A protein has these predicted regions:
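Pseudouridine synthases involved in rRNA/tRNA modification
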Residues: 1-3, 7, 11, 18-23, ...
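Glycine/acidic-rich beta-strand-loop module
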Residues: 42-76
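S4-like RNA-binding module at protein N-termini
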Residues: 1-27, 35-40, 64-65, 71-72
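Short histidine-centered loop motifs in beta-beta connectors
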Residues: 136-138
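Residue-level signal for inorganic ion chemistry
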Residues: 16-17, 59, 85, 124, ...
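Glycine- and acidic-residue-rich catalytic/RNA-contacting loop of pseudouridine synthases
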Residues: 21-33, 69, 86-134, 150, ...
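A short alpha->loop->secondary-structure connector
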Residues: 31-32, 74-81
Length: 227
């Protein structure tokens, strides 16, 4: 497997995480960190994670000091993360904020609760791509396990291909599209379109993604009063 390097900086690098690769080695399969270290000939530090079924932009630090700084940015919610997801179900709402505590359920799954002691927070809006297919643009404000997958399921729109929470397909249609942050007073924005998946390669999706890339797509006005 050859990993794609998206961005290189003296202190960190961004790669494209393919689907089906875990962050850690398991069952004789090398994890993404070791694969990246072998390919690029560097010692790397993990500063955030993506689920095995998720593709997209992933950051690694190149030394311990950068790892501490970037990890702090993630923990302080100072890194803006934008994900793309597809669903064949009509959501309860087309846009909004999904907020609630998460609890472990059966067989490694999670569920969203009505309580808000330590809530997962996800902002989203959605657009119709074609009949029976909807694109969700999501910005998680927290970093809980399975957060976006559980959030969209709670809206009645489980992610296409998510066999844990929805219906099977050729992949789980969740992609880490873009990250934006400031590091040592310099602004960075790194993005990558999804490569894998029949539905992510349809012209209707590609055209919609181009519209998002070319405009100020995020509807800030309806989030001002969210809490």
């Amino acid at each position: 497997m050859t990993l794609q390097r998206l961005f290189d900086h003296p202190d960190f690098m961004a790669i494209y995480k393919p689907i089906g690769v875990g962050m850690h080695s398991e069952s004789g399969e090398l994890g993404l960190q070791l694969l990246a270290e072998q390919q690029f000939g560097l010692k790397l530090w993990m500063v955030h994670r993506l689920d095995k079924v998720t593709s997209g932009v992933l950051l690694f630090a190149k030394h311990a000091e950068a790892a501490a700084q970037l990890s702090n940015l993630f923990s302080e919610q100072s890194i803006q993360k934008t994900y793309l997801a597809l669903s064949q179900s009509k959501p309860k709402r087309k846009q909004g904020r999904i907020k609630g505590d998460m609890a472990a359920a059966r067989n490694g799954s999670y569920k969203l609760l009505k309580t808000q002691s330590n809530p997962a927070i996800t902002d989203f809006f959605s657009l119709s791509i074609e009949l029976g297919l909807r694109l969700f643009v999501c910005r998680p404000k927290t970093g809980k396990t399975h957060q976006i997958r559980v959030a969209l399921k709670s809206e009645g729109a489980a992610i296409l291909g998510d066999q844990r929470y929805g219906q099977p397909s050729d992949r789980t249609y969740l992609h880490a599209w873009r990250i934006a942050f400031q590091y040592q007073k310099e602004a960075f924005q790194i993005e990558a379109a999804p490569l894998e998946g029949e539905w992510f390669n349809k012209n209707t999706f590609i055209d919609k993604l181009k519209q998002l890339e070319n405009g100020n797509y995020w509807p800030e006005h309806w989030l001002k009063n969210q809490n």
